[in-house]
Amino acid sequence: GLCRMKIITMSEMFIHPSVFFILGGLLIPILRGRGKQSYMVVMALLAFLAVVIMPHGTYGIYEFLEWQLTFGNVDKLSKVFAYIFCIMGIIGIIYSIHVKNDGELLAAFYYVGGALGVTLAGDFLTLFLFWEIMAFSSVFLIWYRKSEFSVKVGYRYLLWHVTGGLILLAGIIIKYNLSGDLTINHFPFHGWWPTDLQSLASFLIVIGFIVN
């Protein structure tokens, strides 16, 4: 039979905006001068454009071992936050044009990429992975200040993050063991204190976010 080619319209396109920060950031140490500055601005603008053309729906679904990872869960709320993080990224890049330290620039790129990943994650494992990228990028941003105070603050933040991350992971594991599903949905709370394992999982997940 004849091959059929489907024309993909703008409303059907999904490119994860974090790609422009996480993968795009890898070229930062290679580039120099104005070329680097222009490149960073272009990457941030492309990420913003990716959010503009993102259709509502579920995208980027991959099977990993026995888990289903969903990288793109797009609705009105997630799109609003994606816009916010992209705009923050653009402003931050323009503000940091004078920064010469490639490590600091790379950490900033990874922070925004992690934030976008968290915003669009459709399952808790994907959310946790991007949350870790976001959190560790924050630590390196603090450490790149290279003062005695920033080193102390960075270690303190790292301690809190590891604690919060373990609590969050415990909640995710309990949820998965109970339901066999990592999809992000409602949190079944019954009052302020968990009364069963299902609400305990939700409680730990929320506490993990708060601690972080």
What are these regions (language model features)?
Residues 2, 6-106, 181-186:
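Transmembrane helix-loop-helix hairpins at membrane boundaries of multipass inner-membrane proteins
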Residues 9-20, 74-85, 124-137, 198-209:
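Structural signature of hydrophobic alpha-helical transmembrane segments
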Residues 14, 104, 146, 194, ...:
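Alpha-helix capping and helix-loop boundary segments enriched in small/acidic/polar residues
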Residues 22, 86-89, 93, 111, ...:
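Hydrophobic alpha-helical segments
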Residues 23, 27, 80, 84, ...:
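Residues within alpha-helical transmembrane segments of multi-pass membrane proteins, especially transporters
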Residues 29, 94-100, 139-148, 206-207:
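Helix-loop junctions at the membrane interface of multi-pass solute transporters
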Residues 63-66, 153, 200-212:
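Short helix-boundary/re-entrant hairpin motifs in multi-pass inner-membrane proteins
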Residues 106-110, 114-194:
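Alpha-helical multi-pass transmembrane bundles of energy-transducing inner-membrane proteins
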